[in-house]
Each structure stands twice: as structure tokens, then as C-alpha cells.
């Protein structure tokens, strides 16, 4: 899993994604969930619990939802990071649930 550094108003945050879980279904997965730790250096400021839906993933990359994890993972992370960065710009580094 790839960390990302984000700069907001002169402050650098590190986004540290954790393991992914998929929705339990007999059909194709419709939802993926994972946590992203928001760090200021080594200090944890919050945990963003992110849920990303199949439609969002398909819109970004049509092959990703049913593709191998190395294709799916970057799309999931990118969608979550975009939401988290927007929340950081609004001054919200703490714990919360986000949907993408």
C-alpha cells in the first residue's frame, strides 16, 4: 500500500492506507472499505474510514472492479485520497467516515 504526502495550507500530512475489505456477496463486489491513517510526521491525527462503491471505481477505470488487485488498489486509494484531501482543506484531519 502506498502512502501519499499531501500539503494543505503549508502543513504536510501523510495518508497511510490500511488493508482493504470487500462487501460479502455471491456476485461481484459492490463496495470496498478501508481505513486511512492521517499523520503529521509520526503523530496520528485521525483515521478516515473510507467506503468506495463499484460505480465510482468503474467510472474511473472500467477494468478495475473485476481486475487484479494491482489494478484495483490504486483506483481505490486515489478516490479515497481525493475525499480526504478535500476534508483536510476544510480543516478536518480527525476521525470520520467518508464515501467515494
Named regions from a protein language model:
Residues 1-29:
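Negatively charged, low-complexity tracts enriched in Asp/Glu with abundant Ser/Thr
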Residues 2-3, 45-100:
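Acidic, low-complexity intrinsically disordered segments
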Residues 6, 38, 50:
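Short aromatic-centered micro-motifs
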Residues 11, 41-44:
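Short acidic/polar mixed-charge low-complexity motifs
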Residues 19, 38-40, 57, 65:
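A generic structural signal for solvent-exposed, polar alpha-helical segments
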Residues 30-41:
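A short beta-strand signature
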